[in-house]
Structures are given as structure tokens and as C-alpha cells.
Amino acid sequence: MAKEINNDTIAKFENDLNNHPVFNVASHAAQENGIYKASQNLQTKIDLDPIFSIEIDTGKPADQKQSGRCWMFSALNTMRHPLQKKFKLQDFELSQNYTNFWDKFEKSNWFFENVIATADKDLGDRKVSFLFATPQQDGGQWDMLCGIIEKYGIVPKSVYPETANATNSSALNDTLNTLLRKDGLELRRLVNAGKSEDEVQARKEEMLNDVFRVLAISTCVPPKKFNFEYRDDNHNYHIDKDITPKEFFDKYVGMDLANHISTINAPTSDKPFHKVFSVEYLGNVEGGRQVRHLNLKVDEMKDLIIKQLNNGEVVWFGSNVVKDSERRAGLLATNLYRRDQLFDVDFSMSKADKLDSGESMMDHAMVITGVDIVDGKPTKWKIENSWGEKPGFKGYFVMSDSWFDSFVYQAVINKDILPEDLKKAYDEGKDNPIQLLPWDPMGALAFKY
């Protein structure tokens, strides 16, 4: 065949099309209903009934609304569930807006420091371009939220509720990123003009003052102390006066953040299993907790998740939720749409190839709250989403085990349940993790939004 497409080639393809046994039926279905509806597999819907052999009751799902804070909502959900049970507070939520304020403030400083560190590079350098493309955003990682809580604590949602700019974050992100790009360019000029470190840092502090003002006007000034006043599910009155956010976390949440680690399943050639990885420029708190991922085989990850569920603890996880999913029905399944049968085309790719080619990446974090074990094997998983109660089964989704294999990339595991060889692998690699490039798909959850 010639390099260019010619009329003979097109005629050949048209002849093949006209001789295809299902062309007319398939084209009518797809053109009238759309590709996904025309290829939907009803049997998959039947198979994914919301019944599970292991299940943790976690109450009403939260709602991130028009924001990219899934990672934050899901992480705070894992922390609020034990609190709800212990203190008899069925509908209690931790303040996502509080952590959002400090996350954006810290990300701004993180951006400034990375701009200063790369000031000797050309603006066209890919890493510099990457930094300026999205100075800050809604996305993030488990370790990044832990860094915020370790530094600033946490408060109840009733003390620091959502605001318009938290629930619909596009205007705030646009405003902040405009300011950060302008100031970032100025910091580069100061460094390249030979200004001293003290002079550069002094100017950066003035810039951060502007950032703080933008955030305070948009989302409110976070409290330093507050009264935790509530009635429990038995209508008993309680009040805890003048408590700080860090005191509140220690007293009412108390999760051992340092003992919960991120594991990933990234079966690409550049990421050997049982090694610890980090992603360049991925973080928020300067001098705080570093993002680290221990790479596991998918069956190792599943076994640990099931063990954690059996211990009564839910699991934060990262996935590619837009793939093979139906939001309204709350289903995640690789056979949900049979596009291969509709078009008579092979779309199959390995998980590694999907990651290497950009076909798949982490774009959403949720919480695993249950699993159905049949004949010793997981068949489907119960998922707590953060899209409110309308989609799925009152906000909960059902994920097939094959979808887990294909599109689940990360899970946060209590280190206590790791076997000794994996504990050793993590401990040996955590202080000097292998650095991945900033645009690696294992960092996509933080940079996608």
C-alpha cells in the first residue's frame, strides 16, 4: 500500500464494509442511539447487583459537586467513618473546604519554590512549561492531604462549611493561576537578575500575602479555635470548647496517618514491582510529607484490600473512572459496553500499554467499602463515590473485578497488614524513592483537574 490514501484503497474498504454481515444493523443502532447505548451489555448490569459478602456500613455519600476534590473527599470519608460510629454521628462530615483552603495556599508556595529552583532553565523547557501549565489545581494525592492535616489539623464541616468557590471551583482556579503565573515570571526574573535568596524570598512572601487574601475572600478565613457543639444520634447534647484543628484531629479522628501508605499497580517496564516511587514536582507542603508509592502486583493489592476490609477499615483508591462506566447506573465494568462486537474491531490493550500510550491514567479517587467473594475469589466491589446520592445505588457504585484489573491503579493500605517482605521493600525505598517524570500517569490524579 502507498503511503497516501487513494481512491482504490477507499473503494476496497467500502466493498469490505458492504460485505460485512452486521454493518446495516450496527450502523442503524449506533447512529440512532450513540455508540455506548448501542453497545451496552444488559447481562453485565444484571451481574453487578449490589450484594456483597463483606460490607462496611458507611452511611450517606458526600458530594464534591463541580470541583476536582475527589481525592480530598474520599480521604476525609475514610477518616469520618470511624468517627461517625464512635461518637454516634450518622451524617457527620469533616470540612473539605478547610483542607481545600490550606491545600491551595500550600500549592501556591510549592509552585513558587519550584519556579525559583528552575529559574536557570529556559521557559520552553518541558519541565518549566509543565509547572506553568497548571500552577495549582483541585487535584491531589493521599500523601498531600496527610501533609495538610499533619500541619493544620481538621475541623467539622459545620464549623467551616462549603462556599460557592469550593463547590464550583473553576473561577477560583482561574483567578489563582493567573496570579501565580504572573508572580512566577517575576520570581524567575529576580533570580536571573542575580537578586539574593533573601530578596527573592521576601518578594515571594509578599506574593503569598496576595494569595492568602484571594483565598480568604473566596472561601473564608480558617478558624484557629472553635467549639465543637453537636447532638448525637441519641439526641444527647455535647460541647467541646476552644479546641484547635489539630486537637480536634487527635481527639476525634486519631487516624495514624504515618502508618497508611500508598500502593500502586503500574505494570510498565519502567516501574519494577516492590520498589518505591515518587513523581517530580508532585506535592503541596514544602518541607512536609513526600508522595510515595509502593508498586505491587494487582493480586497483591487485592489481597491487602480484602484483608483491610475484613479488619473493618475502608480503602481509599485511585482509578480511571471515565473508562467503561455508567454514572447514572453506578456501574464500572469492562464488559459494560461491547464496542468490539458493535464494530467488529479489537480494542484490547494491556494495562501497561494503556499507561504507556496515554489511553488510561488515574482521574478519580473513591473508597472501597465492600467486596463479594465467591469460591474464594473477588467478583465485584462496593464503591463509595463523592458525587452525592443521585447516581448509582444512592451514591454507591458497583465495580466488577475485571474493571479493577484494568483501571484501578492505587490503594492506601494500613502498613500493619503488609507482609514482612513488602514492609521491608517499603522501608528500604521510602527515603530515596525512584523519581518519575512530572507527567507520568501515576501523578495524573493530582494534575488532571
Curated annotation (Swiss-Prot):
GO cellular component: cytoplasm
GO molecular function, one term: cysteine-type endopeptidase activity
Reactions catalysed: Inactivates bleomycin B2 (a cytotoxic glycometallopeptide) by hydrolysis of a carboxyamide bond of beta-aminoalanine, but also shows general aminopeptidase activity. The specificity varies somewhat with source, but amino acid arylamides of Met, Leu and Ala are preferred
InterPro entries, per the entry: Papain-like_cys_pep_sf, Pept_cys_AS, Pept_his_AS, Peptidase_C1B
Protein's UniProt name: Aminopeptidase C
Swiss-Prot/TrEMBL keywords: Aminopeptidase, Cytoplasm, Hydrolase, Protease, Thiol protease
Domain of life, source organism: Bacteria
EC supergroup of this enzyme: hydrolase
UniProt-listed GO biological process terms: homocysteine catabolic process; proteolysis; response to toxic substance
